[in-house]
Amino acid sequence: MSSTEEMSSVKNTTQVIGVDPSSTVRVTIVQSSTVYNDTPATLDKAEKFIVEAASKGAKLVLFPEAFIGGYPRGFRFGLAVGVHNEEGRDEFRNYHASAIKVPGPEVERLAELAGKNNVHLVMGAIEKDGYTLYCTALFFSPQGQFLGKHRKVMPTSLERCIWGQGDGSTIPVYDTPIGKIGAAICWENRMPLYRTALYAKGIEIYCAPTADYSLEWQASMIHIAVEGGCFVLSAHQFCKRREFPEHPDYLFNDIVDTKEHDPTVSGGGSVIISPLGKVLAGPNYESEGLVTADLDLGDIARAKLYFDVVGHYSKPDIFNLTVNEHPKKPVTFMTKVEKAEDESNK
């Protein structure tokens, strides 16, 4: 229907719940824009779309990258090599204010929305941990539980100046009654080893919130669906110039930057693809709205008859991936008891 200090080998450690391969699951992508500099209003907007998707039978709802907090396309933050300025500092202060703490009140509200509407929810958000920001995907269950998060491990280009880098401790794949759900954010999808880690954890519904609406992106999504033998859901914002806050110093490529002209700044392209490489819904480049498809879960087994990238088509005697899932912290504090135990073990 249209409209992931100790090193460990990659393995699927999720609890097996089991999915009926004969079942069909309806999933929905929300293609819409952030309300910039207004996180409460963005949450209100998200609620509207979640309610609408659930009313149409969706069991999983996916939002775009950085939907809460906003994807700062064209923002400069006063950045230039060897240059620092007050305007950039103020711009970052405002952006930081729009980000959310995880856990926090906004996360609680999202969990409540997922539970009230009986949906699995995957939400793109800008997370603040102290004064470092992360581009994060948040996962919620239909029982109203916050399951956990994935922090983008490698921001792209100038994103690295405003977002921190996630570590291997937040690369989850959740085993749910509708399938194993995980996420790769934007150009993480171009990292073969990251994708392989998700495949090894058994991902079946591969969520790809993104800020890339190029034609090449569509080709990547089809490739990943076929490579991983999984359903791929790619969510992108659709945003017009008028929806950005007033600012004299945005840099938008190939468009006339005036609110009167009101060009499209983020061009959509949300799409749903089957494990066999078939486009089930989208891409939508025209407007905000819902992109919905019914997933035949039996297609996963059908696809893996001939190609299982971490199973019968792998070659572990030659190629092997190791993933460090230990949290990386800049400072570790040891109590006197821990120090004594450490000394006694030497």
Swiss-Prot record:
Domain of life: Eukaryota
GO CC entries: cytosol; plasma membrane
Single GO BP term: cellular response to sulfate starvation
Active site, per annotation: E65 (proton acceptor), K152 (proton donor), C186 (nucleophile)
Cystine crosslinks: none
A Pfam family the protein falls into: CN_hydrolase
PANTHER family, per the entry: NITRILASE, NITRILASE 1-RELATED
Family statement: Belongs to the carbon-nitrogen hydrolase superfamily. Nitrilase family.
Name of the protein this chain belongs to: Nitrilase 3
Gene: NIT3
